[in-house]
Amino acid sequence: MIWHVQNENFILDSTRIFMKAFHLLLFHGSFIFPECILIFGLILLLMIDSTSDQKDIPWLYFISSTSLVMSITALLFRWREEPMISFSGNFQTNNFNEIFQFLILLCSTLCIPLSVEYIECTEMAITEFLLFVLTATLGGMFLCGANDSITIFVAPECFSLCSYLLSGYTKRDVRSNEATTKYLLMGGASSSILVHGFSWLYGSSGGEIELQEIVNGLIKTQMYNSPGISIALIFITVGIGFKLSPAPSHQWTPDVYEGSPTPVVAFLSVTSKVAASASATRIFDIPFYFSSNEWHLLLEILAILSMILGNLIAITQTSMKRMLAYSSIGQIGYVIIGIIVGDSNDGYASMITYMLFYISMNLGTFARIVSFGLRTGTDNIRDYAGLYTKDPFLALSSALCLLSLGGLPPLAGFFGKLHLFWCGWQAGLYFLVSIGLLTSVVSIYYYLKIIKLLMTGRNQEITPHVRNYRRSPLRSNNSIELSMIVCVIASTIPGISMNPIIAIAQDTLF
């Protein structure tokens, strides 16, 4: 009898929850239509996997890619609509949020074809991989549109949990297990620090959780210049710093890059930074509006440390993935310049433009690492010596992406950095921009060193790995080459196409 009553209560509670969710989607579903497409894609993946055999594997890739493309299309159709706040103030849709969501979807769309051959060769579980990628993408999109402190905390946890699982996907690999453990421990600690910072904001604002209402609450309570706000700023900066991985919050990055499967590293290296940058701009610009001098100083210190340490340590690396890990630390220092500049001198527009180019440059480089690693089983920089003699396409595309990362003209990376540094210079960040220019020169050195190795070999000799290198037929690795071609084209956009890109980015103001 007791069991029967409990069962009825469970059914009633479940029905109420379902009806509440249906009501929210019915009246607010249009606000999160791109996210709903991904949710539908996730459900479809689970249904097909549970009812099909190995012959339907291509359908899994097709459904995942189609869901992402349809979500991008839905975002583009919604472009230039009036800003809207939905779900009782928890979620906001505007051009600024949507362009970051577009960047995250673009990353995921490029990463799936990049992963196909790797998954087949390593015999990884395909469905789970695609589910984690789509779920992480969904979490990143919700983080971009988050409008209150609770959603800002929960959304990155959705992204982070999938990231931990993806990082440890090759369970038999000791390095992967070590990387996942470090990633999980650091991620858990940073989440605790972040929520502690939000608790200080919550108390200081009189119990408000929405970003704009926190500002109004701080004015009412006269706490906007209190020590509690400074404490909240420090804790939140440290918490967000883990996601952005600037120095000195970068300790996990090289180990995770080296130990995780290469397609996973490619995915995490761009999506996490895009989502965290979107969140950081809103958090610093709105709740900490009255503490702009303080958070500007904090971010300047992080940017300087990141640009110097990231680029200097990258010179000493022998692993290609570890080198890109430290390179990404330096790159996030450049992005932070745009966050500091803000709206006043097109800082956000320059940051968005540079991140768009960074996605193509970085994913193009990782596509080369995936392709070479599958043929040789190594990612040691010295083992790339003389690759041009065996695979000219791979060597040339790698060279273009690396040169663009270094910021050499007339490639896209040069114009992205130029606009970013110019906006910083106009905002009076002379020292920060000078450090950025100097460290960019340092980065060119280690990129050119790799390119020289690719083209001429070490002492005019090729390594045994390259000597035994066998390029697969086009039909077997066309997915990686497709991603690489798209990324190379995007990395070599001439300066003439910068103006429309910057104009679109300038429409993303709050």
From Swiss-Prot:
- The protein in question is named NAD(P)H-quinone oxidoreductase subunit 2 A, chloroplastic
Q: Does the keyword Transmembrane apply?
A: yes
The UniProt keyword set, sorted, is:
Chloroplast, Membrane, NAD, NADP, Plastid, Plastoquinone, Quinone, Thylakoid, Translocase, Transmembrane, Transmembrane helix, Transport
Known InterPro entries for this protein?
A: NADH-Q_OxRdtase_suN/2, ND/Mrp_TM, Ndh2_N
Give the record's family classification. Answer: Belongs to the complex I subunit 2 family.
Q: Supply the HAMAP family for this chain.
A: NDH1_NuoN_1
Matching NCBIfam families: NDH_I_N, PRK02504.1
The record describes its quaternary structure and partners as: NDH is composed of at least 16 different subunits, 5 of which are encoded in the nucleus.
Q: Which domain of life is it from?
A: Eukaryota
- Which Enzyme Commission numbers does its entry carry? 7.1.1.-
> What subcellular compartments does it reside in?
Plastid, Chloroplast thylakoid membrane
Extract one GO molecular function annotation from the record: NADH dehydrogenase (ubiquinone) activity
Q: Point out the gene that encodes the protein.
A: ndhB1
Q: What does this protein do?
A: NDH shuttles electrons from NAD(P)H:plastoquinone, via FMN and iron-sulfur (Fe-S) centers, to quinones in the photosynthetic chain and possibly in a chloroplast respiratory chain. The immediate electron acceptor for the enzyme in this species is believed to be plastoquinone. Couples the redox reaction to proton translocation, and thus conserves the redox energy in a proton gradient.
Q: Which organism is it from?
A: Liriodendron tulipifera (Tuliptree)
What membrane topology is given?
A: Multi-pass membrane protein
